[in-house]
């Protein structure tokens, strides 16, 4: 069934139909389309535009269509142009002329705008659940590793000692912001376009506020032309999804590095690893690599959406049909990555002894050694130079700062005393950092309590 054709004298070319149809992908939101139609006819009956008898018949028919699609007895085919015409054709077939009244006071332009918003809202909620699940795993890691010392890095060079809890906490902050972005998008987009018509509203006395309320929106949109052509919320969503993917990619990159024989910080669980067809010894972190690789795919969706929108005049244009496949793919990709990443991280084994040894052997306590001198009256710039000389001495003798004798310390500066060893121990270096946001256990415990309250809110 076509929703148009009265003014045409020729049948649609099959190639044109194949190129023009969207049901092969917009069938994904058949549930949202039916939900929108149920709300629409409920409002029409309330306003006296539709009889209660027709309303009840239409709603019953729509629910039966949804049920039959759900259980597989009704197959969606590409004979229809889109999911809207498929549902309407099946409705008319089931209930007769009453079904022809479904589209009263409505255009496919505001209908698809509604469907896309309903679908996007549902997917934001599902993505948020996955993000929350990841945060719960990261929070458990933080609680269990408050005293797991490791090197912190700048320029991929060992810099200062931190804890695994603190390092994981940095990613917690990223994914925490991601949840905030999704919530912000959901709030801003939560206005109902239904009732905007093709672009100029309708002459029917629709109650748009009532329809918006039925569908869980905060209210109706305020400009009908913008309502049918607005895809800002998709651009914002794709930007947020790209940011989530980027955060997953950064963490995946570190896991790949940590898993290498050169680092040996982590051991991947067998269930989240793959092997080689030729090298029997290989155990590859391919899930982390695929997550890293799929990030570009999500970025591509964002750039495609921006490009689609950049030259479209008001109001609705067929170009907007291109918003769906790329949005669907980006959402599915990020959700899949979140699910796999959470499982991968929750099953990894951290080699705590290797991490602490790496921190000790990388001069990560050099800054604390300089601070020791400053606390004994040496100007910081002079202290910096003194510790630099000690580091050079250690490099030449293949030692860590902790391995130097007191005589060797004093050979560079007489200020050093026996308490230097306690001052540069990994435990002291980390635990004396107690300001909010620092790696010390006391500071971390306060932050963890904040996170717990947020997750349980």
Model regions: which residues?
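A helix-coil-helix interface module used to build multimeric assemblies
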Residues: 1-201, 206-213, 274-275, 290, ...
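Glycine-rich cofactor/substrate-binding loops
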Residues: 1-36, 97-98, 279-457
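Short runs of predominantly hydrophobic/aromatic residues within well-ordered alpha helices
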Residues: 37, 84, 88, 234-237, ...
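Generic, well-ordered alpha-helical scaffold segments in large soluble proteins
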Residues: 40, 61-68, 90, 94, ...
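Short, well-ordered beta-strand elements within core beta-sheets of diverse protein domains
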Residues: 42-50, 163-166, 235-243, 368-377
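Conserved hydrophobic residue
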Residues: 50, 74, 263-264, 379, ...
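A generic structural-conservation signal
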Residues: 53-54, 151, 221, 382, ...
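Charged, flexible cofactor/metal-binding loops and thiol motifs
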Residues: 117, 121-124, 128, 143, ...
């Amino acid at each position: 069934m076509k929703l148009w054709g009265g003014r045409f004298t020729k049948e649609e070319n099959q190639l044109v139909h194949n190129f023009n149809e969207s049901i092969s992908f917009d069938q994904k939101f058949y549930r949202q389309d039916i939900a929108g139609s149920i709300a629409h006819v409920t409002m029409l009956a309330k306003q006296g535009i539709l009889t209660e008898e027709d309303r009840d018949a239409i709603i019953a028919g729509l629910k039966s269509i949804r049920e039959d699609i759900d259980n597989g007895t009704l197959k969606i085919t590409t004979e229809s142009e889109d999911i809207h015409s498929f549902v309407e054709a099946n409705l008319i077939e089931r209930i007769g002329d009453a079904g022809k009244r479904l589209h009263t006071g409505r255009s496919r332009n505001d209908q698809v705008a509604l469907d896309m918003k309903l679908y996007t809202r549902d997917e934001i909620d599902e993505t948020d659940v996955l993000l929350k699940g990841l945060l719960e795993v990261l929070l458990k890691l933080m609680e269990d590793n408050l005293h797991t010392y490791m090197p912190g890095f700048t320029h991929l060079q060992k810099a200062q000692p931190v804890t695994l809890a603190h390092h994981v906490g940095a990613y917690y902050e990223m994914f925490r912001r991601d949840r905030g972005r999704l919530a912000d998008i959901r709030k801003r987009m939560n206005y109902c376009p239904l009732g905007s018509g093709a672009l100029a509203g309708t002459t029917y006395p629709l109650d748009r506020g009532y329809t918006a309320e039925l569908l869980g929106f905060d209210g109706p949109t305020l400009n009908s032309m913008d309502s049918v052509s607005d895809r800002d919320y998709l651009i914002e969503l794709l930007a947020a999804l790209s940011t989530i993917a980027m955060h997953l990619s950064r963490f995946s990159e570190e896991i790949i590095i940590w898993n290498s024989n050169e680092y040996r910080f982590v051991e991947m669980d067998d269930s989240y690893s793959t092997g080689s067809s030729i090298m029997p010894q290989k155990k590859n972190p391919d899930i982390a690599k695929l997550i890293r690789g799929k990030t570009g795919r999500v970025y591509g969706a964002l750039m495609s959406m921006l490009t689609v929108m950049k030259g479209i005049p008001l109001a609705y244009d067929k170009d907007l049909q291109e918003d769906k496949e790329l949005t669907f793919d980006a959402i599915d990709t990020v959700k899949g990555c979140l699910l796999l990443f959470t499982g991968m991280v929750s099953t990894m084994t951290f080699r705590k002894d290797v991490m602490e040894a790496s921190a000790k052997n990388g001069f990560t306590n050099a800054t604390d050694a300089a601070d020791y001198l400053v606390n004994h009256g040496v100007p910081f710039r002079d202290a910096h130079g003194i510790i630099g000389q000690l580091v050079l001495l250690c490099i030449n003798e293949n030692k860590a700062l902790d391995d130097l004798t007191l005589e060797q310390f004093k050979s560079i500066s007489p200020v050093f005393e026996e308490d230097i060893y306690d001052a540069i121990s990994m435990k002291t270096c980390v635990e004396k950092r107690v300001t909010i946001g620092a790696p010390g256990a006391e500071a971390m415990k306060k932050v963890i309590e904040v996170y717990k309250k947020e997750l349980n809110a």
